[in-house]
Amino acid sequence: MTTFYLPKVVYENKIPLDMKKKMMKYMVPKPVDQKSMLLNQPTVVRWLRGDLSFLMKFPLKNKTVDAKKLKVLEDEWGSTMLKLKKPGNAKQWTGQLGEEVCEEVFKLMGKSIKKPVKKNNYQPDFETDEYILEVKTETYYTEGTAGEKILGVPFKYAEVPELYQKPLKIVCIGGAEKSCREQYGILPGEKCTPIKATFLNFFKENQIEYLAFTDFLQGLHFPEIQDSLNLLTDDTKLPPSYTL
């Protein structure tokens, strides 16, 4: 739970009572509106974990052709989900949806999360009391090498931990988590070879670390979110929770 501290002058009765009440009003955090959360949508939780069976609306025959059809369906679904939270043009939905669910999870964990102040032309996605967060989200059916940009984040943001005096956490979401684990080997898995682990340890020693978004989900104990998690099949259950 976030703790708020009033300025010393409040306790010393050096300001009028009505002003104290106004200060208290703005210092009390708003309760989390769980009903409006994207994490309440079962398909969002399934998408986050890589269970895309809800998109399979036709018989799969040809891998290349099927992937193109699924890409269209994934984009239509993503835009629809984002509009539930942010009505309007949701054509470029991937990054926005990732940031929304990341913010939701941290609020559910009782963390204070906000947009950080821009420093030296750096504008990370979020800041908590303990960390700076950079959110990387991808679709599952995007072709090409766009995801390889994630590999360069530690170098690009190498100065961020010193600038903000906080460790940098690179949160991988959706297709980004899948590729980082199964293709690039920067998340735990078979592709994380000893030499890659050496580089990752170097990043961590310099306060930069990659995190898998699904590691946060299992630790949530809100009924609405658990209902979505319980819809996952046995072979798509989430891994043990990751504790910040």
Model features per residue range: what roles?
Residues 2-115:
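Acidic-basic catalytic patches of nuclease active cores, encompassing PD-(D/E)XK
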Residues 100, 104, 154, 193-197:
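Residue-level marker for well-ordered alpha-helical positions
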Residues 102-110, 157-164, 203:
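Hydrophobic, Leu/Ile/Phe/Ala-enriched alpha-helical segments that form helix-helix packing faces
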Residues 117, 125:
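Core catalytic machinery and nucleic-acid-binding channels of phosphodiester-processing enzymes
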Residues 122:
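Beta-rich catalytic cores
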Residues 126-139:
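Conserved catalytic cores of phosphodiester-cleaving nucleases, focusing on short active-site segments
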Residues 137-191:
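Catalytic cores of nucleic-acid endonucleases
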Residues 169-244:
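Domain-level recognition of nuclease-like catalytic cores that cleave nucleotide substrates
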